Amino acid sequence: MKRIAIIGECMIELNGAPFRTMQQAYGGDSLNTAIYMARTAGQSIEIDYVSALGVDTISEGMISRWKLEGINTDYVLRDPTRQPGLYLIQLDEQGERTFLYWRNQSAARYLLQHPGFPNVEHHLANVDMVYLSGISLAILPPTDRQKLINLLHNIKAKGVEIAFDSNYRPALWDTKLEAQACYKQILTLTDLALVTDDDEECLWGDSSQQDTLHRLRNHGVRNVILKQGAKGCLYTDFTTDIPELIATTPIDTVIDTTSAGDSFNAGFLAGYLTNKTPREAALQGHQLAGIVIQHKGAIVPRSATESINFNKEIK
């Protein structure tokens, strides 16, 4: 059985008008991927979520729900002095979303300073793959960010594959140059890059897919998935000059794209780690994302994703 460790932060989500009725949930890019991957892979892959929460009742409830999804929470550290981060989603009259965040003192931000983190370090050296995103890095204090990159360098030398989703969020970085410097370091360690054309344009000013692929190749990335929204994605391992376009099936009714990229990553990684071809893995990601975007919220009901049979051959 393959084993993947997913590093990141899950936050409490409030959705609604201030001082009126609000819906309470939780979400975060890495956690979304972990959940959808657990649903996709079943018992064929062990999925470890690596993060930190408090010892409060909300933290307890979150962990209980993750266990029900089939995620191993042994490496979610508990911080008695901090709690989960919080974000509020507000909708305007046109249905556009705006976000307010309270995360600077979250337990996950100080994950690497937790006294239990050396045990996590030891564990990460013994998994098959570590997956993280630009958000996983952005939330950390700069010294901890560098410590994590150094750790990834050490475990890569021991044979652990590194998968990275760029997931660039400008508001989480002091400057664009700071983000670029960090991404350059992580990309030199990356075996599998899962990037999005919009993010690459925003961070690097890429004007074409060739710009993106050329830059990633120069950083030494071995495998690249370039997500292109409704068009599908491109895959290359740089053994040929032309990347493979893997189209997705158009969705007539799109309700919420919050977890489109996260769920695609989950489906792709589940296929990748169970020895499916890149095309098969990407089609699996497209199928899963296509279901997710037809429902509201970052984490859709299990009944929705159970409608996909990932054990049959994908044509």
PLM features: what roles do these ranges have?
Residues 2, 205, 209-315:
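Conserved phosphate-binding/catalytic region of the ribokinase-like
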Residues 37, 196, 261:
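Short, conserved phosphate/pyrophosphate- and ester-handling motifs at nucleotide-, phospho-/glycolipid
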Residues 90-142:
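Conserved phosphate-binding/catalytic loop of the ribokinase/pfkB sugar-kinase fold
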Residues 18-96, 104-108, 314:
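Substrate-binding N-lobe of the ribokinase-like
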Residues 129, 135-214, 232:
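Conserved beta-alpha-beta core of the PfkB/ribokinase-like small-molecule kinase fold
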